[in-house]
Design a protein with these regions (language model features):
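Long, contiguous binding/interaction regions
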Residues: 1-84
């Protein structure tokens, strides 16, 4: 088995109301920053052992689908890196 870290980033789909991002965007604009858009996201770092990076990614995808993200309102990305 190899040690991996899977990073799952969960964000609201475009078009879903994101009050946290809206408030943050307004505050940044008041501070003089120019933005086109801002979205908030949650990031989960999962340490796990697996035979291959693909196996680790598959397990992280299952975690995202079953608990970390609601597929109706969320998009998510999974990245896997070998731990040293």
């Amino acid at each position: 088995m190899t040690a991996f870290t899977a990073t799952v980033t969960v964000r609201l789909k475009r078009g879903v109301l994101d009050p946290e991002a809206e408030t943050t965007q307004r505050s940044l604009e008041r501070l003089g920053f120019e933005l086109d858009d801002l979205r908030s996201a949650d990031r989960f770092e999962i340490d796990l052992d697996a035979e291959t990076a693909d196996d680790a990614a598959e397990r992280a995808e299952e975690m995202a689908e079953r608990l970390l993200a609601n597929p109706t309102i969320h998009d998510y990305d999974v990245e896997v890196a070998e731990r040293e």
